[in-house]
From Swiss-Prot:
It is found in: Cytoplasm. One of its GO terms (molecular function) is leucine-tRNA ligase activity. It catalyses: tRNA(Leu) + L-leucine + ATP = L-leucyl-tRNA(Leu) + AMP + diphosphate. It comes from the Bacteria. A motif ('KMSKS' region) lies at residues 576-580. InterPro entries: aa-tRNA-synth_Ia (IPR002300), Leu-tRNA-ligase (IPR002302), Leu_tRNA-synth_edit (IPR025709), M/V/L/I-tRNA-synth_anticd-bd (IPR013155), Methionyl/Leucyl_tRNA_Synth (IPR015413), Rossmann-like_a/b/a_fold (IPR014729), tRNAsynth_Ia_anticodon-bd (IPR009080), Val/Leu/Ile-tRNA-synth_edit (IPR009008). Its EC number is 6.1.1.4. ATP binds at residue 579. Gene3D superfamilies: 3.10.20.590, HUPs, Isoleucyl-tRNA Synthetase, Domain 1. GO terms for cellular component: cytosol. This is Leucine--tRNA ligase.
């Protein structure tokens, strides 16, 4: 067993903290590098293997960059508001503030035991009034700019959690947290106008160093489509409605239209005979999430309203249906159905026996099956017959425009960001309601609007804040008369939409941040976290950055220049870790047994960083053996250096061979670590230690050279095993700290060997390997191969037909 243990971890953690080794100085020499891992929620289950896989390897990358001369800023904090703490309070009676503070203290302790070089002096905790004061300031600034507004909207409502759910939080019609069936409810809510930035949010994606899949997900989520808006009038009434379509060329093929169940027009047009069926259908639709309703594989459902629309070009009557695959929040909440040229419309028409009218044929006139969804030539379309799809789009919109019934239109899938939550444990929305003045924003001088501690958590559909008279009743900042506070709190994604801006200036009491400092420090150079945040946190942070830029606070467009998603660490059974499956891994247990560096190195060697994989106890044991072997070999080398016996000063064959491995490893580890390919970097370190072990068995050694090699090995190892490497560096007699050392530089000349090993084949089978001078020409290599004793024996009595030389690699002798 080696000497490395948690005692060594503690020794160096204390020394690093005492000496302020990692304290960030923005004025220090070196190019700024802002490295950020997504901060975590301080849950009761504390730090798990997934947290470690995010934080440990990225800390190693940051250490590597620090040694390369970068001025690294790597802060840490906690995304501390949210539903779990409130649900815990309902269940146990423990106040969210108390449970959260306790969990943060434990997780800080665990993160420090990791030995990461986090800048703790820059910590942010989103539930502290010192932080959420500025979250409220952000709300007020967005409100001033018309980017925060209030409206009534249908929302996903969980009757059990008694709160609004985002579409992403509804799975198979149920709440993802408690599995209760979700319903729809009309509530007056606060929204942020993210749609004002839809074009820029989409257009700037291609300039980011982000995973392709995440970029694609955001593009799809924003969903820009260019098309036309067409107006349909309702038969026998003054009512009308618009539909958005990207295929206005198929307008003459419309055989019915479909309204979203939530479209207010439904109640105005439904016939007496169809009213009951329509009402029942609307109730069923409330139980489905928007994501489920749009599923391609799900069978389409619908019901006839009894009303008809008038086709804008033909004047024919078209039946109006209600269908839940149409969303009130997308486009106009109404679609025109062309079953001959759309798969979804075709399935719906076949199911309900509705007309299917072909209006597009293939360009080459060939017979095509329906639905035919390609571009082509118009037929059965009156004056537009014979036009191509593109020509018809122009001509039909021209005609509709002249009639006042249509126009070109750009539409987005992206909806405004709903930020109201009917919960307690979040930042209060800084607004009061006055009978005289209406909606009145709280003045900045009165921030923060603090959460009251004494509240009732019974889940009854009311925000706990609404039940606190001391909180609710206030005076209007404008007229001084009695007023009531807003009792909803902000979505926790608002807190995390700007936290990266607060870190560098977290002690500022006069402003959320100093723009001069932030514009030097930002954007974040490397951001690491899970891919599940692609369409929420990552999109919201981009929006907030752009909004603050336009207000004059920031001079950059994007918050995160480069983004990496770590993979998922699974249980030993290959399944996602969960307490119910009994397959969770507690880092603390393994750290007690092996030390933090072995745990870290196993995560970095055992898995490709962006992929992850199944945990293996055998894997961590093998990494522990590797660390013990390094210690033994370095002990041997250190003892030889200390004794000073059998020393030589020349660089002979053995020294050149070790020097080759040294520089080969420096190059490989540098390249791989830079790309976060930690597993292959550590594999190179294993090869290097083999070469070092072999050299320490030489009878005579160049001890100055050996010390240089061991020092370089420890420098390369330091980011991956920081405590162990610091200890070995110290034992070698070097000055504190290894992390103040420069990263080793690779010498290309060292990779040019005096001699190279050549394999010799006879008729394609390897018979021997020989060493030849690396600058030997082809004829010389041939001669050396043919003169080798084993080759002479293998070719005896045979005729050499030809000799093929691949320089630096092999010789193949063909005989018969």
């Amino acid at each position: 067993m080696g000497n490395y243990s948690t005692a060594i971890d503690k020794k160096w953690q204390d020394k690093w903290a005492e000496s302020g080794l990692y304290k960030f100085d923005p004025n220090k020499e070196g190019e700024k590098l802002y490295v950020l891992e997504m901060f975590s929620y301080p849950s009761g289950s504390q730090l798990h293997a997934g947290h470690w896989f995010n934080y440990g390897p990225v800390d190693s990358w940051a250490r590597f960059k620090r040694m390369q001369g970068y001025n690294v800023f790597q802060p840490m904090g906690f995304d501390a508001f949210g539903l779990p703490a409130e649900n815990f309070a309902i269940k146990t009676g423990i106040h969210p503030q108390d449970s959260t503070i306790k969990n943060i203290a434990k997780m800080e302790e665990q993160l420090k035991a990791m030995g990461a070089m986090f800048n703790w002096e820059n910590e942010v905790v989103t539930c502290s009034p010192e932080y959420y004061k500025w979250t409220q300031w952000l709300f007020l600034k967005l409100y001033e700019k018309g980017l925060a507004y209030r409206k009534k909207a249908p929302v996903n409502w969980c009757p059990s959690c008694q709160t609004v759910l985002a579409n992403e939080q509804v799975v198979d019609g149920a709440c993802e947290r408690c599995s209760t069936e979700v319903t729809k409810k009309d509530l007056t809510q606060w929204f942020f106008k993210i749609t004002d930035y839809a074009d820029e949010l989409l257009d700037k994606l291609d300039g980011l160093d982000w995973p392709e899949k995440t970029v694609s997900m955001q593009k799809h989520w924003i969903g820009r489509s260019t098309g036309s808006q067409v107006n349909f009038k309702v038969k026998d009434s003054d009512l009308n409605f618009d539909v958005f379509t990207t295929r206005v060329d198929t307008l003459c093929g419309v055989s019915y239209v479909v309204l979203a169940p939530e479209n207010p027009l439904v109640d105005e047009i439904v016939s007496a005979e169809q009213k009951e069926a329509v009402e029942n259908y609307k109730e069923e639709a409330k139980k489905q999430s928007d994501i489920e309703r749009q599923s391609i594989s799900r069978e389409k459902t619908g019901v006839f309203t009894g009303a008809y629309a008038i086709h804008p070009l033909t004047g024919k009557e078209v039946p109006i249906w209600v269908g839940d695959y149409v969303l009130a929040t997308y486009g106009t909440g109404a679609v025109m159905a062309v079953p001959a040229h759309d798969e979804r419309d075709f399935a719906f028409a076949e199911k309900f026996n509705l007309p299917i009218n072909r209006v597009i044929e293939a360009k080459d006139g060939s017979e095509t099956n329906l639905p035919f969804c390609e571009h082509g030539i118009l037929v059965n379309s009156g004056e537009f017959d014979g036009l191509t799809t593109d020509e018809a789009k122009e001509k039909i919109v021209e005609k509709l425009s002249s009639m006042g019934l249509g126009e070109k239109k750009v539409n987005f899938r992206l909806r405004d960001w709903l930020v109201s939550r009917q919960r307690y444990w979040g930042a209060p929305i800084p607004v009061v309601y006055c009978e005289e003045c209406g909606i009145v924003p709280v003045p900045e001088s009165q921030l923060p609007v603090e959460l009251p501690y004494d509240v009732e958590f019974a889940p009854d559909g009311k925000s706990p804040l609404a039940k606190s008279e001391a909180f609710v009743n206030t005076t209007c900042p404008h007229c001084g008369k009695p007023a009531k506070r807003e009792t909803d709190t902000l979505d926790t994604f608002v807190c995390s939409s700007w936290y990266y801006l607060r870190y560098p200036d977290n002690k500022n009491t006069e402003a959320p941040f100093n723009p001069e400092l932030i514009n030097k420090m930002l954007p974040v150079d490397k951001y690491v976290g899970g891919p599940e945040h692609a369409c929420m946190h990552l999109l919201y942070a981009r929006f907030i950055t752009k909004a603050l830029r336009d207000m004059g606070y920031l001079n950059f467009d994007e918050p995160f220049t480069s983004l990496t998603h770590q993979g998922l660490i699974l249980g030993p059974d290959g399944l996602k870790m969960s307490k119910s499956k009994g397959n969770t891994i507690s880092p603390d247990d393994y750290i007690k047994e092996y030390g933090a560096d072995v745990f870290r190195m196993y995560l970095m060697f055992g898995f490709a960083y962006t992929e992850g994989g199944a945990w293996s106890d055998d894997g961590i044991k093998s990494v522990n053996r590797f660390v013990e072997r390094i210690e033994r070999i370095i002990d041997t080398a250190r003892e030889a250096i200390s004794k000073g016996e059998n020393n030589k000063t020349t660089m002979d064959k053995a020294e050149k061979e070790l020097n080759y491995w040294r520089h080969n490893t420096i190059k490989s580890v540098t390249d791989d670590t830079d790309k976060l390919q930690f597993n292959t970097a550590i594999a190179r370190m294993m090869e290097f230690i083999n070469a070092l072990s072999k050299y320490t068995q030489e009878k005579e050694m160049n001890l100055d050279f050996l010390k240089d090699v061991v020092s370089d090995y420890l420098r390369l190892l330091a980011p991956f095993a920081p405590h162990f490497s610091e200890e070995q560096w110290n034992l070698l007699g070097n000055s504190y700290s290894i992390f103040n050392e420069a990263w080793p530089k690779f010498d290309p000349k060292a990779l040019v060997k005096d001699e190279v090993e050549i394999a010799i084949q006879v008729n394609g089978k390897i018979k021997n390997k020989i060493m030849v001078s690396s600058d030997l020409d082809e004829e010389g290599i041939k001669a050396a191969a043919l003169a080798d004793e084993k080759i002479i024996a293998s070719t005896e009595g045979k005729t050499v037909v030809k000799v093929i030389v691949i320089k630096g690699r092999l010789v193949n002798i063909v005989v018969k």
